[in-house]
Amino acid sequence: MSEDFYSVLGVSRDADEDEIKQAYRKKASEYHPDVSDDPNAEEKFKQVKKAKEVLLDDEKRRMYDQMGHERFQEAEKRGATDTDRGRGGMGGMGGGGMGGMNDIFEQFFGGGGRSQSRSGPRQGSDLKTRLKVDLEDAYHGVTKQLTVTRPEECPDCDGAGHPPDADSRTCSACDGRGQQTTVRQTALGRVQQTRECPQCDGKGTIYSETCSTCRGDGQVRNETTLQVEVPAGIRDGQTLRMDGEGAPGENGGRKGDLLVEIRIDDHETFERDGDDLRCRHPISFPQAVFGDTVEVPTLDGAVEMDVPAGTQSGETFRLRGKGMPRLKRRGHGDLYVQVRVVTPESLNEEQREALEAFAEAGGEEIDVEQGFFEKLKSSF
């Protein structure tokens, strides 16, 4: 199964156009075959381009969200996602918009983009939820418990929607087929459409009573706790797919999937920039002047960093390989440490004399008896 387009770009399903464009530029530069050392860079680059093409086209994105990844790709192979035809590109279809395209989808897949009739097995729908993790979890990888409320097969009627001893009769509206067929004239010719029978909800049979537990739905909502494997290096907004943890299928169809969108909490020390991390670290005036070796924090413990003599406040140093793990790739990003020279708030007598001597040696004339605020007051 190929990767969901939202996951390819690392954006949430409600991402706007600017977010998608920004994510595309970042991914495209990361996987461009001319610069990437990833052996699968060319294929990933193609996936990124395809994801951008679909998600930046309003009609294609609407189809994609409605049909899901696999069914959208199947429709695309059949040529059913050519949105230009819905804009008048096929002669006589101008003004048809999505209505005309949806008619074609229903011909291929049935209502809602499904390839099976109601009387046959139907896969359950995918469910979506969010999971919050902290940056340490995203760095090391973690197994998290997630409690979700989801539809499950009714235990009293085994998903049938009626008691096992309920009387039944063949639906007269569809003659027991569970479907009603109509023929429509379109710009592409006569199109036969098959829809679910509204009288029997596609079952072909009408029962004398419904299950009192699920009220005929065949499903009930229950709370369940799942174990979610969060991989090291995952980014904020990326989605994990849990196979078979979605809504139950119908007529023996497989369950849908659970899509877990990862949200990473802000960190008090580090800011994340892709696979890189950034932080600020204080150093003293003597350390900046003479140079020193200081300990700086990383998500894997403190490490030593050399501060050269003459370092200026705001200068940034790069620690290679001390950033985030690269998801599904080898290695880590880098850590960028911006140093800040801290001015002491108070001095003892010895420190004061030393700084006075330093100022005099440099030819600076500073009234050390009068502080800044005293100078400011006396100027008015």
From Swiss-Prot:
It is found in: Cytoplasm. Residues 27-87 have a biased composition (Basic and acidic residues). GO terms for biological process: chaperone cofactor-dependent protein refolding; DNA replication; protein refolding; response to heat. Zn(2+) 2 binds at C171, C174, C197, C200. A zinc finger (CR-type) spans 141-223. Zn(2+) 1 binds at C154, C157, C211, C214. SMART domains: DnaJ. Residues 4-68 form the J domain. GO terms for cellular component: cytoplasm. Residues 88-100 have a biased composition (Gly residues). Keywords: Chaperone, Cytoplasm, DNA replication, Metal-binding, Repeat, Stress response, Zinc, Zinc-finger. CXXCXGXG motif repeats lie at residues 154-161, 171-178, 197-204, 211-218. Its cofactor is Zn(2+). Signal peptide: none annotated. Its main location: cytoplasm. Residues 115-124 have a biased composition (Low complexity). GO terms for molecular function: ATP binding; heat shock protein binding; unfolded protein binding; zinc ion binding. Belongs to the DnaJ family. Participates actively in the response to hyperosmotic and heat shock by preventing the aggregation of stress-denatured proteins and by disaggregating proteins, also in an autonomous, DnaK-independent fashion. Unfolded proteins bind initially to DnaJ; upon interaction with the DnaJ-bound protein, DnaK hydrolyzes its bound ATP, resulting in the formation of a stable complex. GrpE releases ADP from DnaK; ATP binding to DnaK triggers the release of the substrate protein, thus completing the reaction cycle. The J domain is necessary and sufficient to stimulate DnaK ATPase activity. Zinc center 1 plays an important role in the autonomous, DnaK-independent chaperone activity of DnaJ. Zinc center 2 is essential for interaction with DnaK and for DnaJ activity. Homodimer. This is Chaperone protein DnaJ. The gene is dnaJ.
